Amino acid sequence: MAEFVRAQIFGTTFEITSRYTDLQPVGMGAFGLVCSARDQLTAQPVAVKKIMKPFSTPVLSKRTYRELKLLKHLRHENIISLSDIFISPLEDIYFVTELLGTDLHRLISSRPLEKQFIQYFLYQIMRGLKYVHSAGVVHRDLKPSNILINENCDLKICDFGLARIQDPQMTGYVSTRYYRAPEIMLTWQKYDAKVDVWSAACIFAEMLLGAPLFPGKDHVNQFSIITELLGTPPDDVIQTICSENTLRFVKSLPKREPQDLAKLPKFLALVHPDKKPEEDEDYKNTINLLKAMLVYNPKDRISAEAALAAPYLAPYHDETDEPVAEEKFDWSFNDADLPVDTWKIMMYSEILDFHNIDQGGDINPALVEGAGLNQQGFQ
């Protein structure tokens, strides 16, 4: 049995194994608190995420199980990787991952980003999305604060708690407003991996401009701001709207023509000072990729894989080093409506599997407390 120690962080009890020391809070979300820590086994800094009350409701249990399964399955240089997981005696779940120094939101807020950094960051985002989408997974909540970066400019996408299967009937009200694709706002159904490409486009523009491209105050204002830039949605998009209220709202908006992004003052500021916009190939490549990502109809929106081959990302593009998933993620559990105790047993099973512990018969929850800490040289 592993030895557990307790610490109070922001009024929350962190109950972790003695393997991890020097806890410092780094962030808090709706579903968990994240601390940095030192891994005594590897002498490396790590991030320890406490999942708040994972077994309080079936919905939270399922969400935690989904995130655990995804973190186990997704193995890619641009996706955060799981190094340890355990359940404390208080039945809180802790995910341990690599620690990166900052996130893209903090970086954008602190200083203007130079062109080569924007290119490299976008390349890594799209490289990660190509892999995620090839696994049959849609992130659904891509935003600057979910994109982690270290001192070497290595980038990793994190927080897969809202991720879902690629399904033409996918539904739900997801994604932080500024980065939300129009098909989510308009239909609440029939969307796919292209919602992540839209979010990536909004992040791309934010890196270029230093401020959100579509800073809507609410759901209605958000869509109105999008139409100011991209014009009224075309008929083929409007025809997909299923909600009568949404359809009435869209038809009530004034008819707007799309603006030419390349001629907008906020983008013209990106043109090389010694060149005209039409002479600046880098500028044209920048705007062309952004336009291809900001298309109303997801069928016509560029994919993550195709974006990697765009001229803007040519300095980094290498098709032989942009892997896809070896197999699709198994979503068979996703439609299950199960009680908490069943999700708990399934969670225990996944944790034991992560630590390569033979489950042999009934699962004993006590085995999972600090699971794996006596395996493979662990403390």
UniProtKB/Swiss-Prot annotation:
Q: What does this protein do?
A: Proline-directed serine/threonine-protein kinase involved in a signal transduction pathway that is activated by changes in the osmolarity of the extracellular environment. Controls osmotic regulation of transcription of target genes.
Where does it localize? Cytoplasm; Nucleus
Concerning its family, UniProt says: Belongs to the protein kinase superfamily. Ser/Thr protein kinase family. MAP kinase subfamily. HOG1 sub-subfamily.
Q: Which GO terms describe its cellular component?
A: cytoplasm; nucleus
Q: In what residue span(s) does the Protein kinase domain sit?
A: 20-313
- Keywords annotated in UniProt: Activator, ATP-binding, Cytoplasm, Kinase, Nucleotide-binding, Nucleus, Phosphoprotein, Serine/threonine-protein kinase, Transcription, Transcription regulation, Transferase
Q: Which residues bind ATP?
A: V26, G27, M28, G29, A30, F31, G32, L33, V34, K49
So where's the catalytic machinery, residue-wise? D141 (proton acceptor)
GO biological process terms, semicolon-separated: cellular hyperosmotic response; cellular response to oxidative stress; establishment or maintenance of cell polarity; hyperosmotic response; osmosensory signaling pathway; protein phosphorylation; stress-activated MAPK cascade
The catalysed reaction is: L-seryl-[protein] + ATP = O-phospho-L-seryl-[protein] + ADP + H(+); L-threonyl-[protein] + ATP = O-phospho-L-threonyl-[protein] + ADP + H(+)
Give the domain section of the comments: The TXY motif contains the threonine and tyrosine residues whose phosphorylation activates the MAP kinases.
Q: How is its activity regulated?
A: Activated by tyrosine and threonine phosphorylation.
List the Gene Ontology MF annotations in alphabetical order: ATP binding; MAP kinase activity; protein serine kinase activity; protein serine/threonine kinase activity
Q: Which cofactor does it need?
A: Mg(2+)
Do you know which Pfam families this protein is assigned to? Pkinase
Supply the name of the protein.
Mitogen-activated protein kinase hog1
Q: Which InterPro entries match?
A: Kinase-like_dom_sf, MAP_kinase, MAP_kinase_CS, Prot_kinase_dom, Protein_kinase_ATP_BS, Ser/Thr_kinase_AS
Give the sites modified to Phosphothreonine. T171
